[in-house]
């Protein structure tokens, strides 16, 4: 297993460690991010030298978005060590869990579009003699790399557009067959996949590591002799970078093109975190074009809740209705223990009937 030094702010330390471990790295040391980033390296130079001289560390991970100059300067210092920021870390995790050709294409597109400005700045520096190129290739090598990236990006965008058109036609076909589709959305580890499994009887992989659902899974279930299509979508992340939202449009659009949504919220969160989660969830849905379709909010993991369930339920219901319309209903459940699952099935049937 590769070893990593991790730079992260205290408030995101737990999430960052889970992400790094989810990418199959062993965190050997943790450093706080500087309050005032170093202009040249982002992190403190003395800390960079510690990592440079530590032979046990193979990778430096900075849980923030770096500028191209930071990558160039850090990589020049840490020759032989891998350097990742938050976005490259997320893309590496996505690549590990990609289950379809489409997902792999989306990940490659996101990575190429993110790395291209770094290579362009490397080219600029190589022309004035500051940098020898990404692999010591010099100006000509960097020019060739830039041309390759641009060609590959254009090809991937065309292929993904074709997939998008095909999916839209497939969705329209389902609508003509009077099969309503309901997307299950929410943050990673909120219990989306557990709920999908409980409702469908399937056994998708459920993992404590983040991002186990990369390609949306679709499955039709019968409720009161009515066929309803359920879709388990890719999970949200906090502070999701716009580059990833754009690159994963086709995957995230499963939510946009669903007739209705089930938003899964983790009831074990504190009230402040519940508020933050609801606000960011509805913001992400707006960003991908969700508007006007009914949303059924589920407060999940009530078997593990600490505190007053009804107080949290009241908070979630009130805030959800302030942030979005129409909210079909808000109900407490435990996907794992199957608490209130029959009630949820009834609500899904009512929702599907309303859509007809």
Curated annotation (Swiss-Prot):
Q: Which residues form the Hflx-type G domain?
A: 180-356
As recorded in Swiss-Prot or TrEMBL, the protein's gene is named hflX
Amino-acid positions noted as binding Mg(2+) in the UniProt annotation, renumbered to this chain: 193, 213
InterPro entries per the record? G_HFLX_dom, GTP-bd, GTP-bd_M, GTPase_HflX, GTPase_HflX_N, GTPase_HflX_N_sf, P-loop_NTPase, Small_GTP-bd
The record's similarity note reads:
Belongs to the TRAFAC class OBG-HflX-like GTPase superfamily. HflX GTPase family.
Per the record, GO CC terms?
A: cytoplasm
Q: Which PANTHER family match?
A: GTP-BINDING PROTEIN HFLX, GTPASE HFLX
Disulfide bonds, paired cysteine numbers? none
Q: Per its Swiss-Prot or TrEMBL record, what regulates the activity?
A: GTPase activity is stimulated by the presence of 50S ribosomal subunits. Hydrolysis is probably regulated by the HflX N-terminal domain.
Q: Which Pfam families match?
A: GTP-bdg_M, GTP-bdg_N, MMR_HSR1
What is this protein called in UniProt?
A: GTPase HflX
Return the SUPFAM superfamilies for the record: P-loop containing nucleoside triphosphate hydrolases (SSF52540)
Q: Determine the domain of life of the protein's source.
A: Archaea
